[in-house]
Structures are given as C-alpha cells and as structure tokens.
Amino acid sequence: MAPSEKDIEEVSVPGVLAPRDDVRVLKTRIAKLLGTSPDTFPGSQPVSFSKKHLQALKEKNYFVCEKSDGIRCLLYMTEHPRYENRPSVYLFDRKMNFYHVEKIFYPVENDKSGKKYHVDTLLDGELVLDIYPGGKKQLRYLVFDCLACDGIVYMSRLLDKRLGIFAKSIQKPLDEYTKTHMRETAIFPFLTSLKKMELGHGILKLFNEVIPRLRHGNDGLIFTCTETPYVSGTDQSLLKWKPKEMNTIDFMLKLEFAQPEEGDIDYSAMPEFQLGVWEGRNMYSFFAFMYVDEKEWEKLKSFNVPLSERIVECYLDDENRWRFLRFRDDKRDANHISTVKSVLQSIEDGVSKEDLLKEMPIIREAYYNRKKPSVTKRKLDETSNDDAPAIKKVAKESEKEI
C-alpha cells in the first residue's frame, strides 16, 4: 500500500529569501553562537528505528511525539544584518536557505514596553499546514527544541531544560501578547506552539487520540532522549519510527532516454529512471531503478517541469520496487549512503506498531523503576529540571487556538 501522497509543496516557507550578503552575516552569527560551521545545517538528524532501539527505550528516558509531514526549519531571532535596533525573524531549511519573515513579533518576558526583542535565539521545529473542515488552512510552526535563547546556548542541557526555556521565555510571553494584541497577531504568517509530547511509553495515546485528530499529515513517530544533549548532525539517540510502508528514501533522480540510431531523442517516450545515492561532497552512485507505469509517467510529464537531477522521495512497494512519492525540493542532497543503509536495515529489521505496543508495558515499568528516589536523580532534578513545570503548562495552552 502506498503512503499518503500529501505534496510537501503544499507547505511553503513564508517570507522572502534573504539577500546573499545578509545570509553571509546570518550564517556567521549562528556559527559563532553555536561553534559550528557556517555552511552546515546545525539541526539534528534522526536515525531510523530498528529492533535494537527497543532496548534503548527500556534503558533511558524518552519523549515521543508524532512525526509531522511538513518542512523542517530552524527559526532564528536576531537583529537585522544591515539595520541597527531592528528585530528580525528568519526561517532556514536544510539547504541553508534563509527566509526573512515579516509581520511577526516574539515579545520578551516581563517587558511592558514592548520594545525589547530576542537576539541570538534559535529554535528547532517544523512548518505544517493544518486544514480544517470547510477548507480553512492555517500554517503552524511546531517547536520541538530550543538550541539557544538570547545568546545563551542550551544544546548541552537536557531536553526538559531546553523545552522549559522555550516555554518560559518565548511561548508564555507570546501567549500573553496575543491576548492583548489580537489585531497585530491576527496577521502573523503562522502560529507558534510547542509540539505535543508524551512520555516514551505513551504511544498508545498518540496512536488512538493525537494522530487521528491531526489536521496535517503524519508519517510516524519521533523519540527524543531526555538524557542527552542536542546534537548537530546525526544523533544516534534521536529515533525516527515509521510503519514499513512509510519508510522512504530520498534519491537523486536521473532520466536516461533511449538513443535512436537516427533522428532526435523522443523525450515523450518513457525513459529509465535511475536513482542515485549521495556518497559525500558532489559524488553520487547508482543505487536502483525507479518503477514508473504509463499512468504515472503521464502525470510526471504533465508537471511540465524538469524531472532529471532532482531529489525524489521513494517508497518500496509490496513487490520490492522503488516507487515515486513526491519531489523533495526542500533538500539540497539525496540521502547519504549511510542513511540509505540505515533505512534499509529498518525495513528489514522493522518494528511494527504492534511490536511497539507490545513492548510498552515493559518500557513503562522500566521508566518508573528509574524514577525511584536516589541521590543522583535528585541532583539531576536540581540542575536540569527547574523549568520542567513550565513545559506541561505551556504544552496544555499550546493546544488551544492562539
């Protein structure tokens, strides 16, 4: 059975692409703030869930949330690169495309004047498009992590501390501002809220209550370890679970048309659809062919856009054929060969929904055994959980319409 073909193109990043000189300044600021490379996307990347990760859920504490079908973006609050004392908000994707978002404001906690603004604040989240009965659409930015706030980097802190900082310093002031400035916030290009999370053993609630009520696409679950720091790049403790039929790979598509002995190439005839995997730098290697039937070929041609040398997301059908799902123009490169191997391993060694639910009582018992009072646990609470209560309060508020 094919996954739901919700076109990612339906969700577009709001704002205007920043000029090259501004982007250079923004990249430098972020790199200096985080201690990372200016040309590397600083966001974390999950690994595919396999059977071995069931043990990880038993040994460590995790939060779990639904995996939204949207556009992954980091949100950066700063001062405009060229104008002093002008607050600016930018969204940037994995390609390091920076979009200047206007007509949005994130107030500072306890600022009655409304003149203060956040600088060097970096959030991790995803843009999703909620569709309501009657056709109303609402763009949302769902936050699932906080890398830095007002120049202080929190990547080395634990997840509940990072989320607590977002809840206390950003979400709470925003909610209060919204109540008193309804006219101004009504024109915000998107709503901002904390992504709803459950304890690692709470997936039954996600499957039965949360996911069925979503107004945007979903293609799995994300398990985030609460005991580890935020990692730029691949994070082995950040787990991406998908049903087998939703395990997809992003390839580089290349069309190879038959070369006639005489005359011109017939570009309307069906070509070979070659799928390439990324080997690093600018190197790609052939991986497999993509199966396309006549009906699908006609649909692809009807797009009337170049098809070759584009990133395509593919799934493996019941006959082990790679099939087209959608274009991934939000990505600069196809999946790296290491990621491809990980996804294939996940498909081969996959964990079904039933497998997850079967293990949940054991994972839950292990979690509460770890919660038994100990000196170590109390010290950990004192150093990292001081903002945890704010998470629950704001998470509850974030479920309401802003």
From Swiss-Prot:
Disulfide bridge partners, by residue number: none
Domain of life: Eukaryota
Effect after changing K67A: Loss of function
Active site, per annotation: K67
InterPro entries: mRNA_cap_enzyme_adenylation, mRNA_cap_enzyme_alpha, mRNA_cap_enzyme_C, mRNA_Capping_Enz/RNA_Phosphat, NA-bd_OB-fold
Record-level GO BP terms: 7-methylguanosine mRNA capping
Segments crossing the lipid bilayer: none
Localization per record: Nucleus
Quaternary data: Heterodimer. The mRNA-capping enzyme is composed of two separate chains alpha and beta, respectively a mRNA guanylyltransferase and an mRNA 5'-triphosphate monophosphatase.
Family that this chain belongs to: Belongs to the eukaryotic GTase family.
Protein name: mRNA-capping enzyme subunit alpha
Origin species: Schizosaccharomyces pombe (strain 972 / ATCC 24843) (Fission yeast)
Name of the gene: ceg1
